[in-house]
């Protein structure tokens, strides 16, 4: 669950980047995208705090969380600039530069999420190897104990034979009769 959750975080961080660029392109073409803006806002909140609805886990990584706080602030600034674009047009605003700045922050956030996910996957792989080694060791111990039990059973048969048979004649002795 947790590894899949971190992979979803990486995907959504990339989705924020791509969706925002699409929003800017469409807004600059005078096609308002309030629905997409709301989606990106909810994606950012999900990336910061986790979201059951989006099936996003909250990454416990300080660098990622700091970058997401920065990204959230930058998106709020970008939304204000989008409102300005709707009023005066894209050529009278700083929307392109702000969009580029936002893209760079998204890139960094996506990279941090990917690095975190890779660290988690590496730890999981190590734990899987330890578990496999433990299983092999347990099977070896069980096999060793089985071998010892078979040795003891064989020795027991030999001793029972010695206890109940006369060695000189091979016939049952008095212990067998009692």
Which residues are covered by each model-predicted region?
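Juxtamembrane amphipathic/coiled-coil helical coupling segments that flank
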Residues: 90-130
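Conserved nucleotide-binding and Mg2+-coordinating catalytic segments in signaling enzymes
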Residues: 159-178
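Primarily heptad-repeat coiled-coil rod domains in cytosolic scaffolding/tethering proteins
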Residues: 4-7, 11-14, 59, 66, ...
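N-terminal extracytoplasmic segments of bacterial inner-membrane proteins
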Residues: 3-45, 73-84
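Selective recognition of signaling/oligomerization transmembrane alpha-helices
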Residues: 117-160
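Heptad-repeat coiled-coil alpha-helices
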Residues: 29-32, 46-49, 84, 115-118, ...
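Heptad-repeat alpha-helical coiled-coil/4-helix-bundle sensor or tether segments in soluble regions
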Residues: 37-92
């Amino acid at each position: 669950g947790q590894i899949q959750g971190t992979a979803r975080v990486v995907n959504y961080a990339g989705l924020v980047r791509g969706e925002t660029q699409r929003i800017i392109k469409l807004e600059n073409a005078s096609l308002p995208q309030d629905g997409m803006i709301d989606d990106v806002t909810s994606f950012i909140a999900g990336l910061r705090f986790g979201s059951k609805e989006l099936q996003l886990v909250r990454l416990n990584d300080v660098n990622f969380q700091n970058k997401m706080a920065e990204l959230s602030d930058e998106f709020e600034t970008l939304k204000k600039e989008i409102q300005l674009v709707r009023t005066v047009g894209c050529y009278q605003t700083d929307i392109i530069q702000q969009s580029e700045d936002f893209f760079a922050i998204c890139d960094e956030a996506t990279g941090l999420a990917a690095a975190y996910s890779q660290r988690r996957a590496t730890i999981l792989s190590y734990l899987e190897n330890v578990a496999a080694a433990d299983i092999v060791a347990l099977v070896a111990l069980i096999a060793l104990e089985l071998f010892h039990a078979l040795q003891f059973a064989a020795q027991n048969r030999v001793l029972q034979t010695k206890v109940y048979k006369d060695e000189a004649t091979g016939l049952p002795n008095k212990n067998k009769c009692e």
